[in-house]
Curated annotation (Swiss-Prot):
Effect of N47D: In strain: Infectious clone UK
GO biological process: transport of virus in host, cell to cell
Name recorded for this polypeptide: Double gene block protein 1
InterPro entries attached to this UniProt entry: Tombusvirus_movement
Classification via Pfam families: Tombus_movement
Membership in a protein family: Belongs to the carmovirus double gene block protein 1 family.
Molecular functions per Gene Ontology: RNA binding
Disulfide pattern: none
Length: 72
């Protein structure tokens, strides 16, 4: 699923049955959304063949360990 189309309530504290999600499940979902969003942006930039003009990145996660290398 495209991260831009993931409904906001899919990141909520409860699932479709009303049961509360565990912390690990919420964190995993947030990491998945952030990862797909970053991949999507990088692929669009790469496919367009244009130079990067900067932008605003918002990553939502409980814990973040990231190593990112940009070669434009």
């Amino acid at each position: 699923m495209d991260p831009e189309r993931i409904p906001y309530n899919s990141l909520s504290d409860s699932d479709a049955t009303g049961k509360r999600k565990k912390g690990g499940e919420k964190s995993a979902k947030k990491r998945l959304v952030a990862s797909h969003a970053a991949s999507s942006v990088l692929n669009k930039k790469r496919n367009e063949g244009s130079a990067s003009h900067g932008g605003t990145w918002v990553i939502v996660a409980d814990k973040v360990e990231v190593s990112i290398n940009f070669n434009f």
